[in-house]
Every structure is written in structure tokens, then in C-alpha cells.
Amino acid sequence: MTVQKAPVTGPHLLLVDDDRLVLTTTAQALNGVGYHTTTAESVEDAENWLAQGHSRPDLVVLDVQMPGGSGLTLAQRLRELDHIPFMMLSAYSDAETVAYATQQGALAYAVKPIDIAQLIPTIQTALSRANELQELRANRQQLQKALDNERDISMAVGIIMVQHRLKRAAAFDLLRQSARKQRCKLIDLAHSTIQAVETINL
């Protein structure tokens, strides 16, 4: 089996389905409305393609049941690979399967046979949710970085307080003035201050 790629246009979709006819017709229809699609006929094909370091797809659309590997297994792998967003396709619409797919992080669930007219808005909704989640993760990372920087600056100030027997405000001013003189960022000087103490204590 091979992985096929359509010309680059809009959002990048990785389609994974063992039914070649469904895969081809779905890809052609999505290409026709501006999506860029890559197709894989098995979980193994999809995993190999992802392992080759290709550009991160905006959304993976995968079948639940496929010979040689479950789409749900691939879904777990996608979560490990930088939270690659995905939605599920299945001939089954039972509540248990839908609930399990949702628990695994599926952003949408569509039932076969595929109706392209219904699939397109489902994909659009999944892409919108994926963008929202990405923004939330980015904001959380920025917040965590800010908290980490604040902690490290506070540690550096504490070191200066001990070394120079200064109060906190005076120690912070000294750290800030030193950063200006050395033309470096406050956080970089804080890291250097902490590292110097850690080196001495080795």
C-alpha cells in the first residue's frame, strides 16, 4: 500500500481508511473544495508517513476499524505526537464506540456511508475546535513560562539578598541594574546567578 498526496492548497488533512474506493472518492471531493489531502490505506501506512517527518497535518480523519490495526490505536499515537487533532469515521454509531472515541480525544465522529455534503461542515467544526485547543495549549505554555521565569528571578533575588545582605527590593534593583550593564535579559542573568551557585555547591 502507498501513501498518496494531492497538491497543496488549503488545510492539510490526513485520511486513513482501508477502503480504497472510499478513500479516493473522499480525497477527490475534499481536494475539490480546497483541502490538501494525504491518504493512507492502513494504520501502518499512516504511522510510517508520520514517522518520516512530513509537515504536521491540521486534522487526521481515520476509520475506527481497519485490518492490521485499529484507528483508536492510531488515535492514541496522534495524541502523543504533539496532540495532532483527529476525527473518527465508522460504520458503527453505537453510543459506546462514540463515547470511547471521544474519550480518546476525537474532535468529531461521522458515520459511514460518507455523505460529503455532511462531512465537510463536520471537518470544518473539527478544525475550528483544533485551533481553539491549540490556542489554549499555547496560552498555558506561555503562562507556565512566565511563572517559571518569575520563580527563577525570585530565586536569583534571594541569592543576592544572602550574598550582599540586602533587602528584597534592593536585591532586585541590583539584579536589574546588573542586567542593564551587561546588556542581557533579566531572566538570563537570573539563570546565570542560579547556575553559578549550583556549580559552587557541586
Where are these regions (language model features)?
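Conserved acidic segment of CheY-like receiver
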Residues: 7-22, 26-30, 60
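Active-site residues of response regulator receiver
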Residues: 62-63, 90
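Acidic, metal-coordinating helix/loop segments flanking the phosphotransfer/catalytic sites
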Residues: 39-59
